[in-house]
C-alpha cells in the first residue's frame, strides 16, 4: 500500500466518525437531561461498567468525572462475575456502556442493579436489548457504520466517548 493511500483511509475513518457524531448530536433528548440530573444529584459514587472497548471508554469517562469532582470509578463486567459487585451500593449510580446491550458478561451486573434498585443509566445502541429494557435512564447511541472491516468498534466508541464527555 502506498503512503498516499494511508491518508485516504484516515480521511475515510474521520469522515465516518464525524457522521457518527452528527447523528449523536441529533439524537440527544430528555433522557440526556435525566442522566445529567442523576449525576448531579448522586450523593455517593458513580460506577461505570462495560466489556472490552466499552470498558475502556467507561474508564475514561470515570476518570473525567473524577477530575470534575464526581467520585467515580470503572469496573469491568468480567470482574463483576468474580466478586467485584460488592463495591456497588444502593446509593451509587451505575452507568453501563454496551453497543449491543446484550453482552453476556453484563447480565449479572444488570440483575444486581435491578435487584438492589440501584439507578442504572444504559448507554446502548439497540433498543431491543437487555440493557435498554433494564435501564432506568436510556441513552440510545445511534447505530453507525464502523470504519475498516466493520468488525472493530470505531465510530460507535467515538459516540460513547462523546456522550461521556457531554455528561
PLM region spans:
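An N-terminal, well-structured beta->alpha segment
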Residues: 2-44
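Glycine-rich phosphate-binding loops that contact phosphosugars or nucleotide phosphates
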Residues: 44-166
Amino acid at each position: 500500500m502506498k503512503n498516499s493511500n494511508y491518508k485516504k483511509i484516515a480521511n475515510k475513518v474521520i469522515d465516518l466518525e464525524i457522521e457518527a457524531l452528527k447523528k449523536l448530536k441529533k439524537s440527544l433528548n430528555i433522557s440526556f437531561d435525566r442522566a445529567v440530573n442523576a449525576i448531579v444529584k448522586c450523593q455517593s459514587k458513580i460506577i461505570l461498567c462495560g466489556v472490552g472497548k466499552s470498558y475502556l471508554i467507561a474508564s475514561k469517562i470515570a476518570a473525567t468525572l473524577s477530575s470534575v469532582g464526581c467520585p467515580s470509578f470503572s469496573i469491568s463486567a468480567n470482574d463483576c462475575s468474580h466478586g467485584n459487585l460488592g463495591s456497588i451500593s444502593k446509593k451509587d449510580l451505575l452507568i453501563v456502556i454496551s453497543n449491543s446491550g446484550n453482552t453476556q458478561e453484563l447480565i449479572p451486573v444488570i440483575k444486581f442493579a435491578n435487584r438492589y434498585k440501584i439507578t442504572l443509566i444504559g448507554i446502548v445502541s439497540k433498543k431491543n436489548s437487555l440493557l435498554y429494557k433494564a435501564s432506568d435512564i436510556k441513552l440510545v447511541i445511534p447505530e453507525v457504520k464502523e470504519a475498516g472491516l466493520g468488525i472493530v468498534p470505531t465510530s460507535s466508541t467515538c459516540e460513547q466517548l462523546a456522550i461521556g464527555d457531554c455528561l
